Amino acid sequence: MKKNITYIFIFVFSAILFSCNDDFLEKAPLDELTDANFWESELQVKNAANGCYWTLIGKDMMINISEGLSDNALWYTLSGWRQVGSGLYGSDFSTLDGRYKDAYKQLRRCNYFLANYKRAEGIVDSKKLEQYAGEVRFLRVFIYYYLTCFWGDVPFITEPLPPGDERLFDARTPRSEIVDFMLEELDAAAKTLPRYIEPATTSFGRISGAAAKAMESRVALQNERWTVAKAACEALMPGGEYAYHELYTTGRPNQDYFDLFTFEGRASRKAGNKEAILSYVYNFDLPSPTRHNLSRELQVPDQIIRFNATKSMVDSYLCTDGLPIEKSKLYKGDGTYTPAYSAYDSVFVNRDPRLKQSFVYPGYDKWYGKVDGRGTANAAEDASKTNVFRSPKFNNDGKGAVTYTGYYIRKYCEPSKVPLYNQDDNDIIFIRYGEVLLNYAEAMFNLNSLDQDVIDKTINKLRDRVGMKKMILTELQSNGLDLKTELQRERRVELFMEGHRWYDLMRWKQGYELGVDKSETPERQEKGLMKGIRKDYAYDPAVFTATTKFDDKGFLIFDDSRVFSSPKNYLFSLPYRQMELNPNLKPNNPGWE
């Protein structure tokens, strides 16, 4: 099998050059560990740039952290990033301290490269040299993007400082100034990078000019720089300077969206997928394999699944008439049926096709979670259909995949990898063209320029791929639907399990979706409860215990402990340890003082 860009993550020198386990303010200068002759070949420069790619941390950043913070799908234990998203942590929480320290370690790698790469001038082709510098400038922005989203104002360092340097103890720089820097850096980096990188080539996984412009649109959107976001998106759309990428489709509306996130469509090995602009590439076939465990985590066949999707996520999908479930006559999930458990099947009927391409549904025939909620009933009905899913399993008896909410995620699940522990090497997409279209639509809405033509170029392109009814402005109005709400719904549905939801909620000031905010209305407080299926959807409701909680309509309440306080939880607390090391970081963020 082809060996591709995964090699950029596997080399010994950068591990020696850049590894460090001490606190950010206590680490040794990297230049003391560097041979004086290191910058004397392109391979050496490339290896140094490659060392900075660890910044992306693949599945950990986009799924474990970014998705783990959200209300889309909850991690199976109340720990780590789920605990942060739940608002149930303090300034001494180790998860945040670790992320903060790692970010500044990664920044030092980038700063070190950018302070030294020109030592190779006259040895390495100048265009190639600036390309590597452009990649590292992008990666440095990537770090600052998450730092500013998490903590707002943060220490702003753009050069490798020696231990004890007084600048290490500076106060925090305003977020707005760092955003200005990020946008300028991305625009400049794009000019030094190849316009795009073709899928299924040895360079796929490296950063392109298109990736820099897409990241520029993301940074600008998150920070409400609507005009900048609009221009960055237009540079990637037809007629733009960086136009190349397009939505992945093979003309199979019931399959293409799902395939985009499996081996069938992974861009590192499939030349036909031009949607992925930047992906973290894994390869289990290398001598030193790179891998993750996502597919198994979604259907772990003898334990509790790791990501438990919520009722609010499933409810977000429209019916095929383009209406929300509470307005559509086509929605069947509210009815009563005989047998009662068949109501679970009805949840998936007459819905946006992306629902069945994102979630396991009754009749799904690539189920590797072993025994489902019907137990031996599967074999009794048809012994040949052991891989057909029928009902959710709540009984944790070690015989099958257990869900806490009643839903199993199908998106990003490569069926062939479910039985294999930690052997998944599917790409993890960081930026794709579908996000660019959604960024453009939101920017245009906020510029009061979102008309039917823009919707047709963005939202309806995404819907066309799956054969979903188009969004029509006049129909939204006639059905009493709010355009802003529907744009936000589209973003949640299309980008589910891609690590965007928490950032979107922070931008939209909708933190009450993450946990109960006592300052909000009762209706909004209800949104902070994480729920699952209706009790009678279960094949055998007797699996629920006396302590299982349900709301007044019979829907399972999976987690009612989550809290959100505004403005406090719109930013994280600065880590206590870091404030001890540098008192100039104080005061802490609002609400955390």
Task: Identify the residue ranges that each predicted region occupies.
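Bacterial Sec-dependent N-terminal signal peptides
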Residues: M1-L30
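Long, intrinsically disordered, low-complexity segments
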Residues: C20-N21, G90, A103-Q106, F181-L183, ...
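An aromatic- and glycine-enriched ligand-binding surface/loop that stacks and positions planar moieties
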Residues: N21-S79, G209-E216, A220-V388, G515-M530, ...
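Conserved, well-structured interaction surfaces
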Residues: S41-G58, S79-W151, R167-D180, L186-P199, ...
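Structural register within alpha-helical repeat arrays
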Residues: A133, R140, G209, E216, ...
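TPR-repeat structural position
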Residues: V179, W226, L450-Q452
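C-terminal substrate/ligand-recognition segments
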Residues: D345-N460
